[in-house]
């Protein structure tokens, strides 16, 4: 039997980074990567400036650095943001491969086999798992880093209710024939959530993120197609018509082209409610959950890569110090407050304010006020948290325009 100190199921950012840090610290680590080779994670691929500053080695992965972004209100009003601190957009194939290779180079055993939670069994010395190819491995600690649909997470911490999940779906489409493609985030009209267009080195990732309990596939898919067509067609004014149903020959030709060339994807994202954070337990004496498997994603934006990497780092520090159960208190102290505050803000962020969507008013105000615009840019880039967001916005708004 193959024996290890830790068995990590899932080789996304959380699992691979944990494997790297633990192996560097002297632990014997098995990292199980059950995803078919070349199959990308369904994700926009955005990595915040906060993450890039915390782990500058991420800049060595092949990606695109973003210094400016166009933010659109539900009615189509545009706010152009020039970011003080850039963020990056990666192909998840390239990004995940980069982190997995670092884990392997650090001494972790990377095993390209799928693991079912049903085949993970507790023993007197820890855990035994049997892979899809009937290979058997044992370890003292079992780590679930297998994403939002985590089978390990359901086994160890229980299933999350649908209200604690979000849905993201979209298309990978060709880059425009000419010009520099803009990075765009557009808040949805009459829906919770937003659409995005994230240019990567060889394609554009289009998508929509919304809550699972509000999800209706056909109307949202229609909305995404309107957004995609509006993205490729040049705007006639500063108010881009993303959400209009265009039937002119140019739009129809573009639709046919995208139907033939675009590749669809879909995923679930954790978006835990405030009350869930009060009771959710994500580690024990011989197990722990990381990243999306633990529920660590921003409930407002769905961003999870920073929390995947940070949870991996916090867990590795606890384990290497011989205090694995400290992980529960450490993550709550480190970033739990931000996640809870985001959960509390989600309804208001996508609610109404002064007779219009809050996102509409926010962009209107930022278009006329440099201080508010700067804070909004910091929020988008990941440098501005939610805990002191209200105070920062009020302070900026009171300063002269």
Kindly label every feature range from the protein language model.
Residues 7, 11, 21-42:
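Glycine-rich FAD pyrophosphate-binding loop
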Residues 2-6:
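Extreme N-terminal starter segment of soluble prokaryotic enzymes
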Residues 49-100:
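A conserved beta-strand/loop capping segment in the N-terminal third of enzymes
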Residues 31, 144, 290:
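Generic enzyme active-site microenvironment
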Residues 11, 25, 102-243, 295:
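Predominantly flavin-linked oxidoreductase catalytic cores and closely associated redox partners
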Residues 117, 136, 214-318, 324-326:
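FAD/FMN-dependent oxidoreductases across multiple families
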Residues 317-401:
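C-terminal helical "tail/cap" subdomain of flavin- and related membrane-associated enzymes
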Residues 15-16:
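N-terminal Rossmann-fold NAD(P) dinucleotide-binding loop
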